[in-house]
C-alpha cells in the first residue's frame, strides 16, 4: 500500500499566551490550504488578543500574489513582524511588503536576536521562541532541485 506524501511548505504554531505566531517556510510557495490555515490562525489570534506579533523564518519561499491579496483584504491591524531569511534577494523583496504592514522588518539569520527585539520578545521567552522555530523547521518538506 502506497502512502501519500503531502508537502509541507509552511508550518506554524500559535503561542496565544505570548501573543505570538511563529511560522517557518521552505523555498516553495505555500499551498492555498496552508496559507488559508495560517491566515485563519492569525485572524483568530488577532480577534482574541487585539495585539500580537509574527515571527517568520523562510528559506526564500513567500506567498503568491493571490495569497498576498487575501492577506491584504483580511489585515485588520499591522502587527510587528520579523522575517528571518538567509536569502538576500528575499529580504529585499520582503521589505517591499511594508505597503501591507509598515511594521515588517527583515533580518538575516545572524540577526535573529535583533528580529526578536523588533517584535519585543522578552528575554524569558526567547529560548522558547527559538525552540519552537527549530521544531517547526524540522517539519518542513525539503523541496527537490526540480521544484
Task: Cite the ranges covered by each PLM segment.
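Amphipathic, Lys/Arg-enriched alpha-helical "gate/interface" segment within cytosolic domains
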Residues: 2-147
Amino acid at each position: 500500500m502506497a502512502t501519500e506524501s503531502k508537502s509541507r511548505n509552511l508550518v506554524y504554531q500559535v503561542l496565544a499566551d505570548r501573543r505570538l505566531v511563529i511560522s517557518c517556510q521552505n523555498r516553495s510557495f505555500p499551498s492555498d490550504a496552508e496559507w488559508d490555515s495560517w491566515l485563519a490562525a492569525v485572524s483568530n489570534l488577532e480577534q482574541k488578543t487585539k495585539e500580537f506579533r509574527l515571527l517568520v523564518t523562510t528559506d526564500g519561499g513567500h506567498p503568491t500574489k493571490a495569497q498576498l491579496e487575501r492577506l491584504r483584504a483580511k489585515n485588520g491591524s499591522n502587527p510587528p513582524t520579523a522575517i528571518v531569511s538567509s536569502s538576500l534577494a528575499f529580504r529585499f523583496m520582503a521589505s517591499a511588503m511594508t505597503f501591507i504592514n509598515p511594521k515588517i522588518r527583515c533580518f538575516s539569520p545572524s540577526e535573529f536576536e535583533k528580529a526578536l527585539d523588533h517584535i519585543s520578545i522578552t528575554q524569558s521567552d526567547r529560548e522558547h521562541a527559538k525552540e519552537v522555530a527549530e521544531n517547526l523547521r524540522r517539519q518542513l518538506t525539503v523541496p527537490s532541485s526540480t521544484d
